């Protein structure tokens, strides 16, 4: 540091350095201004010690086991850890990566189970709808079969009885192709006769509504999962929609018998939809690979019960009115009523 001082006119210029003391001929005056010129020396960065260091992902470690320090670069004060802690952290990271791989493998196994279950379900549903369409196109003269035979309405209990058997046996229920085709034939024949007695627009509407309800409640099962709050919200929304539908149905100008049929069918469909959501949750979380057929059969029975109930709700009042001889929209009567009058 070099200091240059300037006194008043009586004083002389004096130069001094930091190595030799300053001497002046005049006393220092408080009014004399002092000019300091400081040359800032470049700060020398501390070099690391001569001991060989290792760098592991931004962490500097020392091989000394006793007083080894680890400096981890973070925002704020540096954190000092032992080299053994670094090894532990690396082991934990490796375990975390291994666990994520195991989780991915487990998810892939579940995904394959879902594919098997829903592939079997789609096969069953397509077979039943296809057989019903063949009956509807092949026997057009039997449109009044359900009108003349009220006892056939009891066949809607076939999927309900099958559901009762599957839920009663539980995990002891066999899961093989034989059981699959037994349930498939029993429910497909029932649905085919119901479709044979229905109109084309009623059939198409029932197909679309069944698929829409199945897709909706399967998606809600994935969305709700095991969260009770979500299921409470879903239940509240569904109850509001059901009450709105029943209010509109009861305020309509239909006959009181038709209103009773619509109300009973609406509650039955709600019950089957609840079972469908439960079965979907079982498929998502608790379906082992050796029980894919049984769970697919459960989903199929739920869907067939919903489909037959929709057919009964949409076509039942018409069948009842035709059996009583009520004229249709074009003024014609049914074959049964015309025969009775003649």
UniProtKB/Swiss-Prot annotation:
Keywords: Glycoprotein, Late protein, Membrane, Transmembrane, Transmembrane helix. Signal peptide: none annotated. Pfam families: Bax1-I. InterPro entries: Bax_inhibitor_1-related (IPR006214). It is a multi-pass membrane protein. The chain crosses the membrane at residues 119-139, 150-170, 177-197, 202-222, 231-251, 266-286, 296-316. Residues 36-48 have a biased composition (Basic residues). The keyword Transmembrane applies. Residues 21-64 are annotated as: Disordered. GO terms for cellular component: membrane. The keyword Repeat does not apply. This is Transmembrane protein HWLF3. The lineage of its organism: Viruses, Duplodnaviria, Heunggongvirae, Peploviricota, Herviviricetes.
């Amino acid at each position: 540091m070099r200091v240059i001082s300037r006194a008043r006119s009586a004083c002389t210029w004096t130069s001094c350095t930091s190595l030799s003391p300053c001497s002046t001929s005049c006393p220092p005056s408080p009014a004399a201004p002092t000019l300091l010129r400081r040359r800032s020396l470049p700060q020398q960065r501390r070099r690391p010690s001569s001991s060989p260091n290792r760098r592991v992902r931004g962490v500097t470690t020392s091989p000394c086991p006793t007083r080894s320090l680890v400096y981890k670069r973070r925002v704020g004060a540096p954190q000092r850890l032992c080299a053994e802690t670094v090894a532990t952290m690396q082991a934990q990271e490796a375990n975390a990566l291994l666990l994520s791989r195991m989780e991915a493998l487990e998810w892939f196994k579940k995904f394959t189970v879902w594919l098997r279950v829903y592939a079997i379900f789609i096969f069953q549903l397509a077979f039943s709808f296809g057989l019903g369409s063949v009956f509807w196109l092949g026997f057009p003269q039997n449109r009044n079969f359900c009108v003349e035979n009220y006892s056939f309405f009891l066949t809607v209990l076939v999927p309900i009885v099958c559901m009762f058997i599957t839920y009663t046996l539980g995990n002891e229920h066999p899961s093989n192709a034989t059981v699959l085709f037994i349930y498939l034939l029993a429910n497909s024949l029932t649905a085919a006769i119901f479709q044979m007695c229905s109109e084309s627009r009623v059939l198409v509407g029932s197909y679309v509504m069944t698929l829409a309800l199945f897709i909706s409640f399967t998606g809600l099962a994935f969305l709700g999962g095991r969260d009770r709050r979500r299921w409470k919200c879903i239940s509240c929304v569904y109850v509001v929609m059901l009450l709105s539908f029943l209010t509109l149905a009861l305020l309509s100008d239909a006959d009181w018998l038709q209103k009773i049929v619509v109300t009973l069918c609406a509650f039955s469909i709600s019950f089957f939809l609840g079972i469908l959501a439960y079965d979907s949750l079982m498929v998502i979380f608790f379906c082992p690979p050796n029980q894919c057929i049984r769970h697919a059969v459960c989903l199929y029975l739920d869907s067939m019960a919903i489909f037959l109930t929709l057919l009964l709700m949409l076509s039942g009042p018409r069948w009842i009115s035709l059996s009583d001889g009520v004229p249709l929209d074009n003024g014609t009567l049914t074959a049964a009523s015309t025969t009775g009058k003649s």
